[in-house]
């Protein structure tokens, strides 16, 4: 999985006054969990844009003053309900030998015969939770729709891989090709025409 580097500074004070001052200065207060002790730090709000405002998933390298560096994933985010300004971020530290749970985006590949015939592709699950060692975290979960005919579905079992575990029930639908209204109407009209009685023969 691709990684983003965040450069920050350790926080000496974590009180409300200090937190407000950080935000007024354009910084975001953060906490890194998962190690022996939580690490409180802050970074410029602009540093998080490529991490937060994207559909892609990334791991993070947190570099703080003093030469300290931590591998992590974003665990939680708080944003202002009106301005969408980032208020706080929680991270979870990664270790090479310890599995981590993370949401990974689904990527559609291939061309569906059902779509070519007028069906509508519906993506039911844009992201799926997976559990894996950090080195095995995928950037995407590829869903190949090449075999999908009209009315067919792809379940999470089709995306299984020995390097990671998908944390969803086996009957979870990832995507499906639904019959469009136009195609359904055409099929109904064709069926009616086939059942209609033949016209009377002239004498």
Swiss-Prot record:
InterPro entries the record matches: Rbsml_bL25/Gln-tRNA_synth_N, Ribosomal_bL25/Gln-tRNA_synth, Ribosomal_bL25_b-dom, Ribosomal_bL25_C, Ribosomal_bL25_long, Ribosomal_L25_dom, Ribosomal_uL5_bac-type
CC per GO annotation: cytosolic large ribosomal subunit
Gene3D superfamilies: Ribosomal protein L25, beta domain, Ribosomal Protein L25, Chain P
Keyword Zinc-finger assigned: no
Molecular functions (GO terms): 5S rRNA binding; structural constituent of ribosome
TM annotation in the entry: none
Domain of life: Bacteria
Keyword RNA-binding: yes
Keywords: Ribonucleoprotein, Ribosomal protein, RNA-binding, rRNA-binding
GO BP: translation
Self-association state and partner proteins as the record states: Part of the 50S ribosomal subunit; part of the 5S rRNA/L5/L18/L25 subcomplex. Contacts the 5S rRNA. Binds to the 5S rRNA independently of L5 and L18.
Family: Belongs to the bacterial ribosomal protein bL25 family. CTC subfamily.
Biological role stated in the UniProt entry: This is one of the proteins that binds to the 5S RNA in the ribosome where it forms part of the central protuberance.
Protein name, per record: Large ribosomal subunit protein bL25
